[in-house]
């Protein structure tokens, strides 16, 4: 489920702040969290929800604090995972089913923490390879 938080956010500004604050790491180093890989291999959507992350999220929230309200509202309303998409202000929520997404979208809309919501779907858990 996707929600656009209230307000606007400049992508170049978020990236500049990220670059300014980023602790040096080896060039080109990409670290995929072990918890994320384990959740994907196991097909465990609850573990996957806990493992969702975005390196830009902290910066985006510091530039636009209302994002944290949108993310927290989604979790409080039953999402099993939440994160900022890209540099924001788009928030994405992991749900258990299409019906769960529909209910969450209606609840978030009613909570007044976003300007619009959309339902998105992906592959079924059974299509995730355990190998």
Predicted region positions:
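Anionic-ligand binding region
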Residues: 1-48
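Glycine-rich, charge-dense phosphate/pyrophosphate-binding loop(s)
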Residues: 38-131
């Amino acid at each position: 489920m996707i929600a656009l938080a209230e307000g606007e956010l400049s992508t170049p500004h978020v990236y500049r702040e990220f670059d300014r604050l980023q602790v040096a790491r080896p060039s080109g180093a990409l670290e995929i969290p072990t918890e994320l890989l384990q959740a994907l291999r196991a097909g465990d959507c609850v573990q996957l929800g806990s493992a969702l992350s975005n390196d830009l999220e902290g910066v985006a929230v510091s530039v636009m604090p209302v994002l944290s309200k949108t993310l927290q509202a989604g979790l409080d309303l039953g999402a099993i995972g939440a994160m900022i998409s890209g540099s924001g202000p788009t928030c994405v929520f992991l749900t258990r089913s299409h019906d769960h997404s529909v209910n969450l979208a209606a609840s978030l809309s009613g909570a007044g923490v976003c300007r619009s919501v959309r339902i998105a779907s992906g592959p079924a858990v059974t299509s995730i390879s355990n190998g």
